[in-house]
Amino acid sequence: MEKYYLAVDIGASSGRHILGRLENGKIELEEIYRFENGMDHKDGKLLWDVNRLFGEIVAGMKKCKELGKIPVSMAIDTWAVDYVLLDEKDQILGDTYGYRDHRTDGMDAEVAKILPETELYGKTGIQKQIFNTVYQLMAVKQQTPEFLQQAKTLLMLPDYFGFRLTGNKLSEYTNGSTTQLVNPDTFQWDKELIRKLGYPEDIFLPLQMPGTKVGQLLPEIQKEVGFDLEVVLCGSHDTASAVMAVPQTEGDGIYISSGTWSLMGIESLKPVITEDAAAANFTNEGGYDHRFRFLKNIMGLWMIQSVRHEYNDAYSFAQLCDMAEESKEFPSRVDVNDQSFLSPDSMVEAIRQYCHKTGQPVPESVGELTSVVYRILAQSYGETVRGLEKIAGKTYDSIHIIGGGSNAAYLNQLTADATGKTVYAGPGEATAIGNLLAQMIHAGDLADLKSARKCVRESFEIKTFAPAK
């Protein structure tokens, strides 16, 4: 009888159900269900339809029954920072806002009136981003204070879905850490900070580590999907799950979780909370088994995704890589952090205008456009590596690139050249794999994180890129 585990991995633009099993000591993956996701525009607000998302979770579970592949457990990961407030009857209070909604505009100034930004970073080790939950809750306090008064529980979105499946409310640590309300020394909510900000402290449940059992399915869910299983906590912040799947078996290395955004950093047993780290905008997010993900959020592949989209998705990412390499002599450079690239109506025009404005040759072909972007991305990776090593006080000899961007061979080679380090690329499905690893360790099928990573290295193709001499 084959033993299946189910990873439900929900990103901001799509979600999928992936079944995993161990076959001769190797992890086998099978995607069985996929669905669209996105924030809904409603009355000028950007909202998540959590009922629809929960319906998709259940629909994917039914697919397991159809296929005759019943998992022993499941875990859910999503993006960070978004949450629901539940009343005494466990109903959601108000709307479920998406992190891109503008209600947090100016909320950093409101929080800073109570607590300076340097003090907030010193307490939590989390980089300031205007969509962090700490600012979202300040928006609630300012705009709809009655919701905070009526709230009995705050649950991050994956924890809310776990509650809907099992009837049990648990709060998971890695995603909790992204709220900017967690004490990195205790791995629990910073109740003093929460009180100081005027948020009700009793709505925050004790934080639990990945690998904790949430519960069995509620009878009505069992009836609907046709089976029972155990719901388990994974690193429910998707990046925490992805970093679990970094196939680093010994020594220290830098990782890049490469997708729409690139998250570049190291794993540490202690948070790095210094003035230099704060100035360079590095964050200390929670990781598996009391680890920290000391990382920086940098522009990822979304400039490439935008260019591809403007050409009606006519080229695959592999083709774009090849075309960029063919145009590698094209000399122009752009600054990826320039405001003009944040959300332009046309990324192609934004790149061309930047080159024109700065007196450089203007890229015309797709290859020239993508060449400009890939090289500047590699350059920003190089700068981030140098900053990271300076702050950490040590050098690293390798970089592991995981996630969808690990398939961009040309970018991987440019990254090796720009950093002077050996690059190991893969696996591409890192988030779902990390989700499954937490379940497999919980079940005793894998001994610990070290053996889980060894298993990843042996299960998936990892490509090596050496820096040019």
Kindly label every feature range from the protein language model:
Residues 1-94, 122, 222-231, 419-421, ...:
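N-terminal glycine/serine-rich phosphate-binding loop of ATP-dependent small-molecule kinases
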Residues 2, 6-7, 19, 112-125, ...:
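Active-site core segments that coordinate phosphate-bearing ligands/cofactors
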Residues 11-13, 72, 77-79, 133, ...:
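Short, basic and Ser/Thr-rich N-terminal targeting/leader segments
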Residues 62, 66-98, 127-131, 162-183, ...:
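Short beta-strand-loop/turn "lid" adjacent to the catalytic site in phosphate-handling enzymes
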Residues 70-78, 153, 206, 394-403:
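Short glycine-rich phosphate-binding loop at a beta-alpha junction
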Residues 84, 106-110, 242-244:
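Pocket-flanking alpha-helical
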Residues 101:
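Carbohydrate-associated surface elements
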Residues 191, 197-212, 436:
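A conserved helix-loop-beta module that forms one wall/lid of the active-site cleft
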